[in-house]
Regions:
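Bacterial N-terminal signal peptides that target proteins for export
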Residues: 1-8
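Bacterial N-terminal signal peptides
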Residues: 9-18
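N-terminal hydrophobic or amphipathic helices/low-complexity stretches enriched
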Residues: 19-76, 246, 253, 300
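Extracellular/luminal Protease-associated
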Residues: 23, 31, 108-230, 235-238, ...
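Structural recognition of the beta-strand scaffold that forms the well-ordered cores
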Residues: 40-43, 129-132, 155-159, 198-202, ...
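Noncatalytic luminal/extracellular "stalk/propeptide" segments of secretory-pathway proteins
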Residues: 48-170, 273-276, 282-283, 287, ...
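Soluble metallo-hydrolase cores and metallopeptidase-like ectodomains found primarily
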Residues: 101, 107-148, 230-332, 348-355
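Acidic/histidine-rich catalytic neighborhood of metal-dependent amide-processing enzymes
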Residues: 176, 180-182, 207, 319, ...
Length: 374
Protein backbone atom coordinates (compact mmCIF):
# COMPACT_ATOMS: atom_id res chain seq x y z
CA UNK A 1 0.00 0.00 0.00
CA UNK A 2 2.84 2.39 0.87
CA UNK A 3 4.41 1.87 -2.56
CA UNK A 4 1.09 2.59 -4.25
CA UNK A 5 0.70 5.78 -2.22
CA UNK A 6 4.19 6.95 -3.22
CA UNK A 7 3.44 6.41 -6.91
CA UNK A 8 0.13 8.23 -6.62
CA UNK A 9 1.73 11.14 -4.80
CA UNK A 10 4.35 11.45 -7.53
CA UNK A 11 1.57 11.51 -10.11
CA UNK A 12 -0.33 14.16 -8.16
CA UNK A 13 2.76 16.33 -7.88
CA UNK A 14 3.48 15.94 -11.60
CA UNK A 15 -0.12 16.86 -12.41
CA UNK A 16 0.30 20.19 -10.67
CA UNK A 17 3.82 21.18 -11.69
CA UNK A 18 3.34 19.99 -15.27
CA UNK A 19 0.17 22.02 -15.90
CA UNK A 20 0.22 24.81 -18.51
CA UNK A 21 1.49 28.03 -16.98
CA UNK A 22 2.63 26.30 -13.79
CA UNK A 23 6.17 25.33 -14.64
CA UNK A 24 7.64 27.75 -12.10
CA UNK A 25 5.67 26.33 -9.19
CA UNK A 26 7.47 24.90 -6.21
CA UNK A 27 6.67 21.42 -4.96
CA UNK A 28 3.15 21.48 -3.44
CA UNK A 29 2.28 20.62 0.14
CA UNK A 30 0.95 17.11 -0.47
CA UNK A 31 1.21 14.38 2.13
CA UNK A 32 0.55 10.67 2.09
CA UNK A 33 -1.15 11.02 5.47
CA UNK A 34 -3.71 13.52 4.17
CA UNK A 35 -4.37 11.46 1.05
CA UNK A 36 -4.85 8.30 3.14
CA UNK A 37 -7.16 10.18 5.52
CA UNK A 38 -9.52 11.11 2.69
CA UNK A 39 -9.55 7.53 1.38
CA UNK A 40 -10.28 6.11 4.83
CA UNK A 41 -13.10 8.60 5.38
CA UNK A 42 -14.82 8.18 2.02
CA UNK A 43 -14.62 4.38 2.16
CA UNK A 44 -15.82 4.11 5.76
CA UNK A 45 -18.99 2.16 6.55
CA UNK A 46 -20.82 5.34 7.56
CA UNK A 47 -20.70 6.46 3.91
CA UNK A 48 -22.66 3.30 3.00
CA UNK A 49 -20.89 2.68 -0.30
CA UNK A 50 -21.64 6.18 -1.70
CA UNK A 51 -24.54 5.15 -3.93
CA UNK A 52 -26.46 8.03 -5.55
CA UNK A 53 -29.89 8.59 -4.10
CA UNK A 54 -29.01 7.19 -0.67
CA UNK A 55 -27.89 8.59 2.68
CA UNK A 56 -24.37 7.75 1.53
CA UNK A 57 -24.72 10.29 -1.27
CA UNK A 58 -25.66 13.04 1.18
CA UNK A 59 -22.69 12.28 3.45
CA UNK A 60 -20.28 12.14 0.53
CA UNK A 61 -21.45 15.39 -1.01
CA UNK A 62 -21.40 17.17 2.35
CA UNK A 63 -17.85 15.95 2.97
CA UNK A 64 -16.58 17.09 -0.43
CA UNK A 65 -18.19 20.52 -0.15
CA UNK A 66 -16.79 20.97 3.37
CA UNK A 67 -13.27 20.00 2.24
CA UNK A 68 -13.37 22.34 -0.76
CA UNK A 69 -14.58 25.18 1.47
CA UNK A 70 -11.85 24.40 4.00
CA UNK A 71 -9.30 24.90 1.22
CA UNK A 72 -10.80 28.29 0.38
CA UNK A 73 -11.93 27.30 -3.12
CA UNK A 74 -14.79 29.06 -4.86
CA UNK A 75 -18.03 27.36 -5.94
CA UNK A 76 -17.71 25.97 -9.46
CA UNK A 77 -21.34 26.37 -10.54
CA UNK A 78 -22.18 30.03 -10.05
CA UNK A 79 -22.69 30.48 -6.33
CA UNK A 80 -23.09 26.76 -5.69
CA UNK A 81 -20.70 23.87 -5.25
CA UNK A 82 -23.38 21.53 -6.62
CA UNK A 83 -24.48 20.80 -10.17
CA UNK A 84 -27.69 18.78 -10.10
CA UNK A 85 -27.93 16.02 -12.71
CA UNK A 86 -31.52 15.00 -13.58
CA UNK A 87 -31.83 11.23 -13.38
CA UNK A 88 -34.55 8.64 -13.48
CA UNK A 89 -34.65 5.64 -11.17
CA UNK A 90 -36.05 2.42 -12.62
CA UNK A 91 -36.59 -0.60 -10.38
CA UNK A 92 -37.45 -3.92 -12.00
CA UNK A 93 -39.80 -6.22 -10.13
CA UNK A 94 -38.43 -9.44 -8.66
CA UNK A 95 -40.80 -11.39 -10.92
CA UNK A 96 -38.75 -10.49 -14.01
CA UNK A 97 -38.89 -13.40 -16.44
CA UNK A 98 -36.57 -14.57 -19.24
CA UNK A 99 -36.76 -17.73 -21.33
CA UNK A 100 -33.99 -18.62 -23.78
CA UNK A 101 -34.91 -21.51 -26.01
CA UNK A 102 -36.63 -24.06 -23.79
CA UNK A 103 -34.90 -22.91 -20.59
CA UNK A 104 -36.77 -20.71 -18.12
CA UNK A 105 -34.04 -18.80 -16.28
CA UNK A 106 -34.03 -17.86 -12.61
CA UNK A 107 -33.80 -14.14 -11.89
CA UNK A 108 -30.49 -13.21 -10.24
CA UNK A 109 -29.29 -16.82 -10.12
CA UNK A 110 -29.09 -17.39 -13.89
CA UNK A 111 -29.71 -13.93 -15.30
CA UNK A 112 -30.39 -10.30 -14.58
CA UNK A 113 -32.54 -8.22 -16.92
CA UNK A 114 -33.83 -4.67 -17.00
CA UNK A 115 -35.04 -2.04 -19.42
CA UNK A 116 -33.96 1.55 -19.88
CA UNK A 117 -37.29 2.40 -21.48
CA UNK A 118 -39.44 4.49 -19.16
CA UNK A 119 -42.47 2.23 -19.20
CA UNK A 120 -44.29 0.45 -16.36
CA UNK A 121 -44.28 -2.90 -18.18
CA UNK A 122 -42.41 -4.35 -21.13
CA UNK A 123 -42.01 -7.70 -22.83
CA UNK A 124 -40.36 -9.51 -25.72
CA UNK A 125 -41.97 -12.58 -27.28
CA UNK A 126 -40.46 -15.18 -29.60
CA UNK A 127 -37.48 -12.99 -30.50
CA UNK A 128 -34.92 -14.91 -32.62
CA UNK A 129 -31.58 -15.28 -30.85
CA UNK A 130 -28.52 -14.19 -32.82
CA UNK A 131 -24.95 -14.68 -31.60
CA UNK A 132 -23.17 -11.47 -32.64
CA UNK A 133 -19.71 -12.21 -31.25
CA UNK A 134 -18.37 -9.20 -29.38
CA UNK A 135 -21.12 -6.99 -30.79
CA UNK A 136 -18.62 -4.51 -32.21
CA UNK A 137 -18.91 -2.15 -35.15
CA UNK A 138 -15.51 -0.45 -35.58
CA UNK A 139 -15.04 0.87 -39.14
CA UNK A 140 -11.58 2.22 -38.31
CA UNK A 141 -10.51 -1.35 -37.49
CA UNK A 142 -12.37 -2.98 -40.36
CA UNK A 143 -14.61 -4.83 -37.90
CA UNK A 144 -18.39 -5.32 -38.06
CA UNK A 145 -20.01 -8.11 -36.06
CA UNK A 146 -23.45 -7.07 -37.30
CA UNK A 147 -22.59 -7.14 -41.01
CA UNK A 148 -25.43 -8.47 -43.13
CA UNK A 149 -27.83 -8.92 -40.20
CA UNK A 150 -31.14 -7.13 -39.71
CA UNK A 151 -31.54 -7.13 -35.93
CA UNK A 152 -35.03 -5.66 -35.81
CA UNK A 153 -37.17 -7.87 -33.58
CA UNK A 154 -34.19 -10.06 -32.68
CA UNK A 155 -32.15 -10.54 -29.52
CA UNK A 156 -28.37 -10.21 -29.61
CA UNK A 157 -26.24 -12.64 -27.58
CA UNK A 158 -22.94 -10.87 -26.94
CA UNK A 159 -19.45 -11.62 -25.63
CA UNK A 160 -17.84 -9.28 -23.11
CA UNK A 161 -14.47 -7.57 -23.77
CA UNK A 162 -12.63 -7.30 -27.13
CA UNK A 163 -11.51 -9.84 -29.75
CA UNK A 164 -7.90 -9.15 -28.78
CA UNK A 165 -8.40 -10.45 -25.25
CA UNK A 166 -9.40 -13.96 -26.31
CA UNK A 167 -6.54 -14.28 -28.81
CA UNK A 168 -3.94 -12.42 -26.72
CA UNK A 169 -2.98 -10.71 -29.97
CA UNK A 170 -1.56 -7.21 -29.28
CA UNK A 171 -2.25 -6.24 -32.91
CA UNK A 172 -5.98 -7.02 -32.59
CA UNK A 173 -7.74 -4.04 -31.03
CA UNK A 174 -5.39 -3.51 -28.05
CA UNK A 175 -4.75 -7.11 -27.17
CA UNK A 176 -5.64 -7.83 -23.56
CA UNK A 177 -6.11 -4.14 -22.78
CA UNK A 178 -9.83 -3.45 -23.08
CA UNK A 179 -11.01 -0.68 -25.39
CA UNK A 180 -14.38 1.03 -25.13
CA UNK A 181 -15.66 -1.55 -27.61
CA UNK A 182 -15.18 -4.16 -24.91
CA UNK A 183 -17.24 -2.44 -22.22
CA UNK A 184 -20.76 -3.55 -21.42
CA UNK A 185 -22.05 0.00 -21.89
CA UNK A 186 -20.91 -0.03 -25.52
CA UNK A 187 -22.42 -3.47 -26.16
CA UNK A 188 -25.91 -2.27 -25.23
CA UNK A 189 -25.49 1.03 -27.07
CA UNK A 190 -24.51 -0.74 -30.29
CA UNK A 191 -27.34 -3.24 -29.99
CA UNK A 192 -29.69 -0.27 -29.73
CA UNK A 193 -28.20 1.32 -32.85
CA UNK A 194 -28.76 -1.97 -34.66
CA UNK A 195 -32.44 -1.95 -33.68
CA UNK A 196 -32.28 -5.10 -31.54
CA UNK A 197 -35.33 -5.99 -29.47
CA UNK A 198 -33.12 -7.54 -26.81
CA UNK A 199 -29.43 -7.58 -25.86
CA UNK A 200 -27.92 -10.22 -23.57
CA UNK A 201 -24.25 -10.28 -22.55
CA UNK A 202 -22.56 -13.55 -21.55
CA UNK A 203 -20.79 -13.14 -18.22
CA UNK A 204 -17.36 -14.77 -18.38
CA UNK A 205 -15.43 -13.83 -15.24
CA UNK A 206 -11.99 -13.80 -16.88
CA UNK A 207 -12.59 -11.23 -19.65
CA UNK A 208 -15.14 -9.37 -17.52
CA UNK A 209 -12.65 -9.09 -14.63
CA UNK A 210 -15.38 -9.33 -11.98
CA UNK A 211 -17.51 -12.18 -10.57
CA UNK A 212 -21.21 -12.84 -11.04
CA UNK A 213 -22.10 -11.36 -7.65
CA UNK A 214 -20.84 -8.00 -8.91
CA UNK A 215 -23.33 -8.26 -11.75
CA UNK A 216 -26.06 -9.25 -9.28
CA UNK A 217 -25.38 -6.30 -7.01
CA UNK A 218 -25.01 -3.79 -9.82
CA UNK A 219 -28.39 -4.61 -11.35
CA UNK A 220 -30.35 -5.46 -8.23
CA UNK A 221 -32.67 -2.73 -7.05
CA UNK A 222 -32.95 0.80 -8.49
CA UNK A 223 -31.10 1.54 -11.74
CA UNK A 224 -30.21 5.13 -12.55
CA UNK A 225 -30.21 6.74 -15.96
CA UNK A 226 -30.23 10.16 -17.56
CA UNK A 227 -33.60 11.67 -18.38
CA UNK A 228 -34.07 11.35 -22.15
CA UNK A 229 -36.70 13.27 -24.11
CA UNK A 230 -37.92 10.09 -25.83
CA UNK A 231 -38.01 8.04 -22.65
CA UNK A 232 -35.16 5.89 -24.02
CA UNK A 233 -37.54 4.44 -26.61
CA UNK A 234 -34.57 3.63 -28.85
CA UNK A 235 -33.01 1.20 -26.40
CA UNK A 236 -33.63 -2.57 -26.62
CA UNK A 237 -36.82 -3.60 -24.84
CA UNK A 238 -34.81 -5.93 -22.61
CA UNK A 239 -31.12 -5.75 -21.70
CA UNK A 240 -29.27 -8.08 -19.39
CA UNK A 241 -26.62 -10.64 -18.50
CA UNK A 242 -26.62 -14.43 -18.32
CA UNK A 243 -24.13 -16.65 -16.51
CA UNK A 244 -21.53 -18.61 -18.45
CA UNK A 245 -23.10 -22.02 -17.58
CA UNK A 246 -26.45 -20.83 -18.95
CA UNK A 247 -24.74 -19.54 -22.10
CA UNK A 248 -22.97 -22.87 -22.56
CA UNK A 249 -26.31 -24.69 -22.34
CA UNK A 250 -27.90 -22.30 -24.83
CA UNK A 251 -25.08 -22.64 -27.35
CA UNK A 252 -24.92 -26.43 -26.94
CA UNK A 253 -28.64 -26.64 -27.73
CA UNK A 254 -27.85 -24.74 -30.94
CA UNK A 255 -25.08 -27.17 -31.88
CA UNK A 256 -22.18 -24.97 -30.82
CA UNK A 257 -19.62 -24.78 -28.05
CA UNK A 258 -18.80 -21.61 -26.14
CA UNK A 259 -15.05 -21.87 -26.69
CA UNK A 260 -15.59 -22.62 -30.37
CA UNK A 261 -17.69 -19.49 -30.88
CA UNK A 262 -15.41 -17.36 -28.71
CA UNK A 263 -12.42 -18.17 -30.93
CA UNK A 264 -14.44 -17.77 -34.14
CA UNK A 265 -15.76 -14.39 -33.00
CA UNK A 266 -12.23 -13.22 -32.21
CA UNK A 267 -11.03 -13.56 -35.81
CA UNK A 268 -11.43 -10.95 -38.56
CA UNK A 269 -14.31 -11.69 -40.90
CA UNK A 270 -16.58 -13.24 -38.26
CA UNK A 271 -20.26 -13.25 -39.18
CA UNK A 272 -23.20 -13.40 -36.79
CA UNK A 273 -24.84 -16.79 -36.24
CA UNK A 274 -28.56 -17.53 -36.02
CA UNK A 275 -28.91 -19.76 -32.96
CA UNK A 276 -32.23 -21.18 -34.21
CA UNK A 277 -33.81 -20.49 -30.82
CA UNK A 278 -36.00 -17.74 -29.44
CA UNK A 279 -36.14 -15.45 -26.43
CA UNK A 280 -39.17 -14.35 -24.46
CA UNK A 281 -39.13 -12.13 -21.41
CA UNK A 282 -41.11 -9.63 -19.40
CA UNK A 283 -40.66 -7.30 -16.48
CA UNK A 284 -42.47 -4.61 -14.53
CA UNK A 285 -40.92 -1.33 -13.43
CA UNK A 286 -41.32 1.22 -10.68
CA UNK A 287 -40.21 4.61 -12.02
CA UNK A 288 -39.09 7.64 -9.99
CA UNK A 289 -37.52 10.89 -11.21
CA UNK A 290 -34.89 12.57 -9.09
CA UNK A 291 -31.45 14.18 -9.30
CA UNK A 292 -27.93 13.59 -8.03
CA UNK A 293 -25.20 16.23 -7.73
CA UNK A 294 -21.80 16.68 -9.23
CA UNK A 295 -19.59 18.63 -6.83
CA UNK A 296 -17.63 21.50 -8.39
CA UNK A 297 -15.00 23.81 -6.93
CA UNK A 298 -12.72 26.31 -8.61
CA UNK A 299 -9.44 28.11 -8.04
CA UNK A 300 -9.52 31.28 -10.21
CA UNK A 301 -6.62 31.84 -12.58
CA UNK A 302 -4.31 34.79 -12.05
CA UNK A 303 -3.87 35.68 -15.74
CA UNK A 304 -6.48 33.82 -17.80
CA UNK A 305 -9.44 33.32 -15.43
CA UNK A 306 -11.81 32.43 -18.29
CA UNK A 307 -9.65 29.53 -19.43
CA UNK A 308 -9.96 26.30 -17.45
CA UNK A 309 -8.00 23.21 -16.53
CA UNK A 310 -10.36 20.51 -15.24
CA UNK A 311 -9.53 17.63 -12.89
CA UNK A 312 -12.23 14.96 -12.58
CA UNK A 313 -13.00 11.86 -10.53
CA UNK A 314 -16.30 10.13 -9.82
CA UNK A 315 -17.39 10.03 -6.19
CA UNK A 316 -20.05 7.31 -6.42
CA UNK A 317 -19.80 3.58 -5.79
CA UNK A 318 -22.20 0.61 -5.52
CA UNK A 319 -23.74 1.16 -2.09
CA UNK A 320 -25.14 -1.93 -0.38
CA UNK A 321 -26.13 -5.33 -1.72
CA UNK A 322 -29.43 -6.98 -0.92
CA UNK A 323 -27.95 -10.37 -1.84
CA UNK A 324 -25.76 -10.61 1.26
CA UNK A 325 -26.47 -10.46 4.99
CA UNK A 326 -24.07 -9.10 7.57
CA UNK A 327 -21.39 -6.88 6.05
CA UNK A 328 -23.20 -5.86 2.87
CA UNK A 329 -21.49 -2.54 2.13
CA UNK A 330 -19.36 -2.09 -0.98
CA UNK A 331 -16.97 0.47 0.48
CA UNK A 332 -15.26 1.38 -2.79
CA UNK A 333 -11.84 2.33 -1.43
CA UNK A 334 -10.12 1.75 -4.78
CA UNK A 335 -13.16 2.53 -6.93
CA UNK A 336 -13.15 5.41 -6.47
CA UNK A 337 -12.28 6.83 -3.07
CA UNK A 338 -8.68 6.89 -4.30
CA UNK A 339 -9.57 9.07 -7.28
CA UNK A 340 -11.83 11.39 -5.29
CA UNK A 341 -9.19 11.70 -2.59
CA UNK A 342 -6.66 12.46 -5.31
CA UNK A 343 -8.91 15.28 -6.47
CA UNK A 344 -8.94 16.77 -2.97
CA UNK A 345 -5.19 16.31 -2.62
CA UNK A 346 -4.48 17.98 -5.97
CA UNK A 347 -6.68 20.89 -4.87
CA UNK A 348 -4.70 21.13 -1.64
CA UNK A 349 -1.48 21.26 -3.64
CA UNK A 350 -2.69 24.09 -5.84
CA UNK A 351 -3.90 26.13 -2.86
CA UNK A 352 -0.64 25.63 -0.96
CA UNK A 353 1.61 26.55 -3.91
CA UNK A 354 3.28 29.97 -3.63
CA UNK A 355 2.63 30.84 -7.26
CA UNK A 356 -1.00 30.60 -8.31
CA UNK A 357 -2.02 29.08 -11.64
CA UNK A 358 -2.46 31.40 -14.63
CA UNK A 359 -5.61 29.56 -15.70
CA UNK A 360 -8.58 28.70 -13.53
CA UNK A 361 -8.54 25.16 -12.18
CA UNK A 362 -11.83 23.30 -11.77
CA UNK A 363 -12.14 20.30 -9.45
CA UNK A 364 -15.11 18.19 -10.53
CA UNK A 365 -16.37 15.20 -8.53
CA UNK A 366 -18.90 13.39 -10.70
CA UNK A 367 -21.94 11.28 -9.88
CA UNK A 368 -23.40 8.14 -11.46
CA UNK A 369 -20.27 6.70 -13.09
CA UNK A 370 -21.10 3.28 -11.70
CA UNK A 371 -24.47 3.50 -13.43
CA UNK A 372 -22.76 3.84 -16.81
CA UNK A 373 -23.62 7.52 -17.20
CA UNK A 374 -20.04 8.81 -17.37
Amino acid sequence: MLRIQRVLLLCLTAAITGCTGLGRMQAPAISAEEYARHIATLSADEFEGRKPGTAGERKTVEYLVAEFKKLGLEPGNGDSFLQQVPIVEITAGSDARLQLGSAELKYMQDMVIWTKRLVPEISVADSPLVFVGHGVVAPELGWNDYAGVDMRGKTAVILINDPGFATDDPKLFRGRAMTYYGRWTYKFEEAARQGAAGAIIIHDEVPAAYPWDTVQNSWMGPQLDMVAADGNAGRPAIEGWITLPIAEQLLKASGHGYRELLLAASKPGFRAIDLKQKASGALRNAIRRSSSPNVMAMLPGSKYPNEYVVYMAHWDHLGRTLARSGDNIFNGAVDNATGTSGLLTIAQGFVAAKEKPERSVVFLALTCEECGLL
